[in-house]
């Protein structure tokens, strides 16, 4: 490394210092998903980011998805994926595979990556410590022919109804980094598959997290010219949904951000997980790396 490169690194570290102080002892929930989960190099960069957050005095919590991996396993086992209104129908056999893939495979891969940095990660799901309880999701769609609203039966797809933060509070006082799969029990004894974005939002809300980061495959919220919004208020975000600037799959993502803020999260960021070290760029630099949504 040349002297100029060393000076550049030193300057970057010095610039990061006030942000390290700003987030010390703060909780940051990171929803990990999208393209980054399938790229080994990006996976290692993500693990290093989480490790550095912990070493800097931050309390990081990882929530992960795994839709493509679930689909691949169902195909491998000869089970056809069924969708209603764009949502996966999860019968008893499917939810068993979902739990196996999310809590048994993907979760442990992420834990191993973080542990390779020298930090201690622990794999969990909503069942552990009675952390999360769910109930059957209530979803409706408008029939395009009759224009009548009908209820979708998605099987064991759930919505979070209760978060007990006791276990997470204990882990926050330890050296452990929680990595959580979005699977949870219901009071009815069934296991439910929960959308990872809404699961992460529920966890962050229960903890009154300082930040909730959504790692996606896009840079953030874009205007009609394709330029990135660096920061939006909840009111501004709602107006952009109303006028069509925010559309398609970004609508439920932004609505989840708004729900998390209403639950007590101080700020939610949508950022590009395909950019190496995007978590550090967002937390420890002045301009961040995505779109910050605030109250």
From Swiss-Prot:
Q: Name one GO biological process term.
A: L-arginine biosynthetic process
GO MF annotations in UniProt: acetylglutamate kinase activity; ATP binding
Record site feature (Transition state stabilizer), residues: 31, 253
Tell me where it resides.
Cytoplasm
Which CDD domains does this UniProt record tie to the protein?
AAK_NAGK-C
Q: What is its EC number?
A: 2.7.2.8
Q: In which pathway does it act?
A: Amino-acid biosynthesis; L-arginine biosynthesis; N(2)-acetyl-L-ornithine from L-glutamate: step 2/4
**Catalysed reactions, as listed in the record:** N-acetyl-L-glutamate + ATP = N-acetyl-L-glutamyl 5-phosphate + ADP
> What enzyme class is recorded for this protein?
transferase
User: A Pfam family this protein belongs to?
Assistant: AA_kinase
Q: Which InterPro entries match?
A: AceGlu_kinase-like_sf, AcgluKinase_fam, ArgB, Asp/Glu/Uridylate_kinase, Glu/AcGlu_kinase, NAGK-C
Q: Which GO terms describe its cellular component?
A: cytoplasm
Q: Which residues bind substrate?
A: 66-67, 88, 193
User: Where is it predominantly found?
Assistant: cytoplasm
Keywords recorded for this protein, A-Z: Amino-acid biosynthesis, Arginine biosynthesis, ATP-binding, Cytoplasm, Kinase, Nucleotide-binding, Transferase
Free-text function comment from the UniProt entry: Catalyzes the ATP-dependent phosphorylation of N-acetyl-L-glutamate.
Which family does the UniProt entry place this protein in?
Belongs to the acetylglutamate kinase family. ArgB subfamily.
Q: What is this protein called?
A: Acetylglutamate kinase
* Organism in which the protein naturally occurs: Allorhizobium ampelinum (strain ATCC BAA-846 / DSM 112012 / S4) (Agrobacterium vitis (strain S4))
Which gene codes for it? Answer: argB
């Amino acid at each position: 490394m040349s002297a100029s490169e060393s000076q550049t690194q030193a300057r970057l570290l010095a610039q990061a210092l006030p942000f390290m102080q700003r987030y010390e002892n703060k909780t940051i929930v990171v929803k990990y998903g999208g393209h980054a989960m399938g790229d080994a190099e990006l996976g290692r960069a993500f693990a290093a980011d989480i490790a550095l957050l912990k070493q800097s005095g931050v309390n990081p919590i990882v929530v992960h998805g795994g839709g493509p991996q679930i689909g691949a396993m169902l195909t491998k086992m000869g089970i056809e994926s069924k969708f209603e209104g764009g949502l996966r129908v999860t019968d008893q056999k499917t939810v068993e595979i979902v739990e196996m893939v999310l809590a048994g495979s993907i979760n442990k891969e992420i834990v191993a990556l973080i542990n390779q940095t020298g930090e201690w990660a622990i794999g969990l799901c909503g069942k552990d410590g009675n952390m999360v309880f769910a109930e059957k999701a209530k979803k409706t769609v408008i029939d395009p022919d009759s224009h009548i609203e009908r209820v979708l039966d998605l099987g064991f797809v759930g919505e979070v109804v209760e978060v007990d933060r006791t276990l997470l509070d204990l882990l926050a006082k330890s050296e452990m980094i929680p990595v959580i799969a979005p699977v949870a029990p219901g009071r009815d004894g069934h296991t439910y598959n929960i959308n990872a974005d809404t699961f992460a939002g529920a966890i962050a809300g229960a903890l009154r997290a300082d930040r909730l980061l959504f790692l996606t495959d896009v840079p953030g919220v874009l205007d009609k010219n394709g330029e990135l919004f660096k920061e939006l208020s909840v009111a501004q975000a709602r107006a952009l949904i109303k006028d069509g600037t925010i559309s398609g799959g970004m609508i439920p993502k932004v609505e989840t951000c708004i729900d998390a803020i209403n639950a007590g999260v101080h700020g939610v960021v949508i950022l590009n997980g395909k950019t190496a070290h995007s978590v550090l760029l967002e937390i420890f630099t002045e301009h961040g790396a995505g779109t910050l949504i605030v109250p």
